[in-house]
Amino acid sequence: MKIINLLAYQILDSRGQPTVAVKLFLENDQSVIAMVPSGASTGAKEALELRDGDVNYFFNKSVKLAIQNINNIIRPHLINKNVLNFFELDNLLINLDGTENKSKLGANALLGVSIAIVKAGAIAASKPLYQYIKEDLMHNYDVNYYAPIPLMNFINGGAHADNDLDIQEFMIVPLNAISFSQAIQIGSEIFHQLDKLLKSNHLSTTKGDEGGFAPMLKNNYVTLELLVHAIKKAHYLPSKTQGVCLALDVAASELYENGKYFFKKSSSHNITLEQTSFSSDEWIKYWSKLVSMFPIISIEDCFEENDWNSFALFLKNNPHIQVVGDDLYCTNLKYLQKGIDFKATNAILIKPNQIGTISETLDVIKFAQKNNINTIISHRSGETEDTFIADLAIGVGAGQIKTGSLSRSERIAKYNRILEIEQELKDKLIYEPSKFFKFR
C-alpha cells in the first residue's frame, strides 16, 4: 500500500512545550498520526532534538525547523513508496540525515516519520499494531504475548518536580499480580493510599511532570518509608520475592560534579539528615545500603553516564536486583555493546527518541534480548497522548514499561491501551514477572 502524503505540524507536549506531530496518508483514504515526546534530564549521548533557538517564538523551544525538514526534505522521498517496506524506508530516513546523532534533520523529525510508517504499516497489513511489530518487524510468530510489568512512578523528584528530592523517580512494581489489569488495580490502590498518607501528614499532593506526587520530604529514607507504608495501608506486602517492590531512577548524571556525587536540592535547603557529598566508592555503599534496607528490586542510572566501572562494581555487589542503564546507553547499540563488555548492567531502558528511528530501536532491543539484558520500554517526561510505546512494549516482548504514575491523561493513555490489548488477547497475554526478574 502506497504513501500518498505526509504532513508534519507543531503540537504541544504534556509540559506545554512544542513538539512534532506527523500525519501520514495512505492510498485507501486512511491515515495515522505520530507524536514525538521530549525528555527533561537527557543523556549526553542522545540523538539531537532539533529546536529553532528563536527567542521570540516559544522562547527557543519551537520545532519549526524539524517540521520543515519533514515537509520539504523527507516527504518527497516517501510519496508513492510502499509503506510495508519499513526497514527500507527507515534506512532512507537515516541516510537522508547522514549524521551519527541525527543533527541534520533532527531526531524528533526522523522519529515522528518512523513511528508513522510503523502505524501505517499495521493498517496496510490489517493487523493490530502490537501484532504487526511482533510478526513483521521482530519476526516472532509465537501465539502468546507478554504483558509488560509496570514500573509506576508515584513520587517525582529531581528534574521532574519542584521539590527537595534529588532522586528523580520513586516507583512501585507489582510483582505479585497475575495479570496486567491486576497490576494496575494494585498500583491504583497504593496510589490512593499514598494520597491519603500525604494529606494526613499535611504534605502536598501536587504532581510532578510524570504524574507522581511531589511533596517536600526530608530525605530518601523518609520517602521510601512512606511508600512502604502506603503499600501496607493498601493491604499488600512490601517484598522483593512475593509482593510489591520498589524501584528508583536516580538520574545520577544530574548529581555528578567534579568527580563527586551530591544531593544538591535537599542539601541546599538543609533539610536532609543524610550525607550530601560522596566519592564513587561511598556512592556505591550508599545505594547498596538502601537496597539492603528496603524492598528495592530495580535501580536506574545510579551512576554518572560515563562511570562504567562503578556500574559494574555495583552490579557485582548486588546481583539480585535489576541495575538499569538509561543515560549510560541512550538506546544506542554501540554503548550497549560496551556495557555488555563491562558487565555494567543487567537491564536497559529503551527510549526511541534517544536514537531517532524505530528500526534502530528494534536493533537495540534484539541485541539486548539476545544477551539476556532486560528491556524496559519508556516514556519521556514531556509526553503526548500517543500510545505507540504500549504496543511497542507488547510487540517486542519487553517485559517491562515505564510510563509514569496513575494520574495525568498522557500517562494513563498508555496503561489504558495495554488494558485494551489485554481484552483483545485474553489468556494469550501473559503477565509473568518470574520470566523478567530471574535474578531475584
Swiss-Prot record:
Annotated Mg(2+) binding sites: D249, E300, D326
One GO biological process term: glycolytic process
GO cellular component terms given for this protein: cell surface; extracellular region; phosphopyruvate hydratase complex
Record InterPro entries: Enolase, Enolase-like_C_sf, Enolase-like_N, Enolase_C, Enolase_CS, Enolase_N
Protein name according to UniProt: Enolase
Compartment(s) of residence: Cytoplasm; Secreted; Cell surface
PANTHER family, per database record: ENOLASE (PTHR11902:SF1)
PROSITE patterns on file: ENOLASE
Family affiliation: Belongs to the enolase family.
Keywords: Cytoplasm, Glycolysis, Lyase, Magnesium, Metal-binding, Secreted
Active site residues per record: E210 (proton donor), K351 (proton acceptor)
EC code(s) of this entry: 4.2.1.11
Purpose: Catalyzes the reversible conversion of 2-phosphoglycerate (2-PG) into phosphoenolpyruvate (PEP). It is essential for the degradation of carbohydrates via glycolysis.
Manner of cofactor binding, per the entry note: Binds a second Mg(2+) ion via substrate during catalysis.
Pfam families associated with the record: Enolase_C, Enolase_N
A GO MF label: magnesium ion binding
UniProt-annotated binding residues for (2R)-2-phosphoglycerate: Q168, K351, R380, S381, K402
Pathway: Carbohydrate degradation; glycolysis; pyruvate from D-glyceraldehyde 3-phosphate: step 4/5
Catalysed reactions, as listed in the record: (2R)-2-phosphoglycerate = phosphoenolpyruvate + H2O
Cofactor: Mg(2+)
HAMAP family tied to this protein: Enolase
